[in-house]
């Protein structure tokens, strides 16, 4: 009888942990990141000293607000890194400066060597 009760209690505890556990994958999708940053592609290919146009900042701000938890920020980082690798002639200095021009703080620098697992 005690063993049966212990087993039931263990099952309830496991179920509670599963229900309360965060999803293993962030809520941010690759397509969401891509569509938010697509207007910026031409800008990050050049040596742009001029301020970023407002529509670029809108996409960056929407990504920032969508990345509320660490897993989302890591997922966004991975997507940004993947997108940047696919853009020919990307100027990483311009890309890294874009969030700052938009007054958006992200917890990492956009670069090909970023370790997205370390993003907090």
Swiss-Prot record:
GO terms for molecular function: lipid binding. Gene3D superfamilies: Plant lipid-transfer and hydrophobic proteins. GO terms for biological process: lipid transport. Residues 1-26 form the signal peptide. PROSITE patterns: PLANT_LTP. Disulfide bonds join 57-102, 77-116. Plant non-specific lipid-transfer proteins transfer phospholipids as well as galactolipids across membranes. May play a role in wax or cutin deposition in the cell walls of expanding epidermal cells and certain secretory tissues. This is Non-specific lipid-transfer protein 6. It comes from Gossypium hirsutum (Upland cotton).
